[in-house]
Amino acid sequence: MEYNVKDFGAKGDGKTDDTDAIQAAIDAAHKAGGGTVYLPSGEYRVSGGDEASDGALIIKSNVYIVGAGMGETVIKLVDGWDEKLTGIIRSANGEKTHDYGISDLTIDGNQDNTEGEVDGFYTGYIPGKNGADYNVTVERVEIREVSRYAFDPHEQTINLTIRDSVAHDNGKDGFVADFQIGAVFENNVSYNNGRHGFNIVTSSHDIVFTNNVAYGNGANGLVVQRGSEDRDFVYNVEIEGGSFHDNGQEGVLIKMSTDVTLQGAEIYGNGYAGVRVQGVEDVRILDNYIHDNAQSKANAEVIVESYDDRDGPSDDYYETQNVTVKGNTIVGSANSTYGIQERADGTDYTSIGNNSVSGTQRGIVQLSGTNSTFSGRSGDAYQFIDGSTGNDLLTGTPIADLIVGGSGNDTLSGDAGNDVLEGGAGSDRLTGGEGADIFRFTAVSDSYYTASSSVADQILDFDASNDRIDLTGLGFTGLGDGYGGTLAVLANSDGSRTYLRSYEKDADGRYFSLTLDGNFVGRLDDSNLVFRHKTIAGTEGDDSLTGNAMAEILDGGSGNDSLAGGLGNDVLRGGAGDDILNGGLGRDQLSGGEGADIFRFTSVADSYQNSGDNFSDLILDFDPGEDRIDLSGLGFSGLGDGHNGTLLLWTSSETNRTYLKNFDTDADGRRFEIALEGVFSDLSEKQLVFERLVLEGTRLGDQLSGTELNEELLGGAGRDILNGGAGDDILDGGSERDTLTGGSGADVFRFNATLDSFRNYDNGTSRVDDITDFTVGEDLIDLSALGYSGLGNGYDGTLAVLLNADGTKTYLKDRESDADGNHFEIALDGNYADQLSNGDFIFTNLEVIGSSSQAA
C-alpha cells in the first residue's frame, strides 16, 4: 500500500518543516504491516529530535521511502541546525529494523546553512552490541552537503544493497560500510567528498563491490580497512570493475584486511599510489589498468607494505603476507618510481607476474621479501636503481638490475638476476648476488688511490666463471705489470684479497685500483675482464642490432638499420642509410652516418644529469638538414627556458657543442640532457620531434605507411591497410575491414566502436579487422572505449579467445551483439590462444553512474 506524505500534511515547499508529517506517514505504513511512503516532487525540510540518535526521520521495518527521482524529491535539513544528527534518515537505535529501504530521492545536509555534525543515511543496531538490521535496500539516492558521512550503514547491518546512487560534496566519506555482513555496492558514484569516496571498515565481511566510481575526493578513492579500533580484520571483499581517479591520496587503499580481491578496475591520476596495501594477508590485485598516479609526490604505482600499529589500538605490527599482483597494465607518471614496490619491512610471499609495466622512473618491480617471486612478461625491461650524492644503500631485485651509486661511499647489492653495478665516485662496496653480474667502472675517479689516501672500491663476491668487470671506459689495454696502459694483478699476504692496479697516475695524481675479496691471481683474463668494446656488426641490408648490459659498438653498416644500445656505455654507428639510433641507458656516443637518421630517446634515464654525475649521450654527426631527434615519448612540449616541460637550446662555441637541457628534475633527481657535437643555434621543431605524428586517411580505402618515428595512423572509413613501420605507433583502422601491421616497436591497436571491427551472423556481414604481427608482451590492443572488462567467455562484458581449425588465426569475440546484431570481433594472424592475457589489452570497465547528471 502507498502512503503519500501530502495526505499527512507535508507541503514540500522548501519552507515548511515537514518532519512530523513524513514521520506520520512512515508510522502509518509500519502500523499497517508495511508499505511504501511516497514523496512527490518537491523540497521537504526536516529537523532532528532531542538526541543525535533520534535522527530526523526514523524508518521502520517493512517500510520503503520512495521519491520521484534524484533531484526531484529533495529531503533537506532546515537552516540553522547546530546539533549532532546521526542520520537525516535512519533506522531506530537498538530495534533490529528489517526489510526497509529508500529510493529515487535526494538527501541534502544543507551544509552551508547549518553547523551541526550531520550524517545522511544511517542504519544498524547498537555499536558493540549483539543485534543487527537486515535486508536493507537503497537505490537511486543522492546524498549531498552533509557535514559528515553521506551513506553510513553501521554496526551491524546484514544483507544491505546500495546501487545506482551518488554521494558528493560531503564533509567526510561518501559511502561507508561499517560492520556490514553480506553487503552489495553496485554502480555508485562518489565524488568531491572531504575524505574517502568509499570506506569499507570495522570487521565488515562478505562484501561485493561492483562497478563503483570514486573521483576528486580529499583522501582515498576506496579504503578497505579495520579502522581505528582493535577489531577483527575486514575479510572476503570482492572489488570488481569501476574506476578510482583524481583523488587526493591513494586510488585504492587496502589496510589490515584479509581475503580481498581487486580486479578489472581503472585507477589513475591519484595523488599518491594507485594501489597501496598495508598489513594484509591474501590480497589479489588482478587485471587492472593502473596508470599516471603519484601526482602529488613520488610513489610507486602499486605499493605492498606492512603496517605498524604499535602506537595504535592493537599495539601490534602487521606484516603483509601473500599478496598477488598479476595481469595488470601499469603505466607510470613523471613521479612514479616503480610499477610495483614491495617494501623491506617484513613484507613477504608477494607473487608478481604477467604484468605490463612501462613509464616508471626507477624500474618495473622492487621486491624485498625472501620468499617473494617475480615472473615478467616478454619485453619487460631491467630495473634501474639510481643513487644520490650521499652514502647510499641500494638493493636490487630478483630480476636484472642496473644499480648506479653516484657519488658518495655507497653499498650496492644486486640480489638475484644478471645485474650491472656501477659504484661511481667514492669508496663503494659492491655485491652482485646470484646471477652473472657486471661491475662497471667508467673513470679512474671511480676507484683509485693516491700518495696519501685510498678511495678504492671493493667487490665482495666476484665469481670469475660468471661475473665480469667492465673497464672499457678507462683506456687500459689488458693485464700486465701495471705500466704502459696495463693493470697488474696481485694478492695480499694471506690471499684473502686481490688487487687490480695501475702504477701510472692520471693528471690529478690518481692511480686506478680495485679490490676483490678472495684470491684471483691467475684466474683473471679476457673472459672476465672487459677492456675493449665488443663490436656487433650489421650487413649491407636493413639490420636490427640490439646491445646488452656490456659496453658495445653497434655498427649498422649500409642499409636502413635500427640500433638499440641497451645498458652499457655504447657506441652506435648507423653507417649509410636512414637509421634509427637509441642508445638506451648509459653514456652513449651516437653517429648516424650518411642518410636521414633518427636519434630516439624514450626515457629521461636514457640521457641525463643529476647532482652527482653526468650520463648524457653525445651525438657526433648531427645533420640538421636531414636528421631528427625523436623526443615524442618524453612529454616535452617544445623549446623554451628548460622549465615547465620545455627544453633549453644552449650552444657553446668554446667547446663546439650544442645542448638540449631540461632543468626540472624527475622523482629521482634526474634532469634530461643531450649533447651534440657542433654548434646548432637554429635547431627547431623541424629537427626536434616533440609530438607523435598523425597520418590520416579518407572515406575511401587508404594505404598508410609510417616511418621510423612514433606515429598515429587513422584509417577512417574504407578498407584500409595500415603499416606503422618502425617506432612505437598507434593504429586505428576506423570502420570497414582493415589490415593492421604495427611493424617494429611497441605498438597499440586501437578500436573505438563495435563497428570498427565486427561480424553479423544474422545477415552474414563480416567487417573484421586483421592484426598481422601482434607481439605479446610488447604490443597492446586498446579497447578502452568499448567497455570490456577483460578476457572471458565472451559474455557479460568479456571477450572470448578462439582459434581457427588449422591454428593460423586467433579471434577475439564478443558473443553478445548490439541492437543491430553486430558482434565485436578482431582477428590476429597466428596462434595466441594460450598466450594472451589481460595485460595485452587496455580495458576500461563500464562506469554505470545512475542519474548523476541530475545530481550535479
UniProtKB/Swiss-Prot annotation:
Inhibited by zinc. This is Alginate lyase 7. The lineage of its organism: Bacteria, Pseudomonadati, Pseudomonadota, Gammaproteobacteria, Pseudomonadales. One of its GO terms (biological process) is alginic acid biosynthetic process. It catalyses: Eliminative cleavage of alginate to give oligosaccharides with 4-deoxy-alpha-L-erythro-hex-4-enuronosyl groups at their non-reducing ends and beta-D-mannuronate at their reducing end; [(1->4)-beta-D-mannuronosyl](n) = [alginate](n). One of its GO terms (cellular component) is extracellular space. The keyword Glycoprotein does not apply. GO terms for molecular function: calcium ion binding; isomerase activity; poly(beta-D-mannuronate) lyase activity. Converts beta-D-mannuronic acid (M) to alpha-L-guluronic acid (G). Has both epimerase and lyase activities. Contributes to abortive encystment by degrading the coat from inside the cyst. Important for cyst germination. Composed of one catalytically active A module and three R modules.
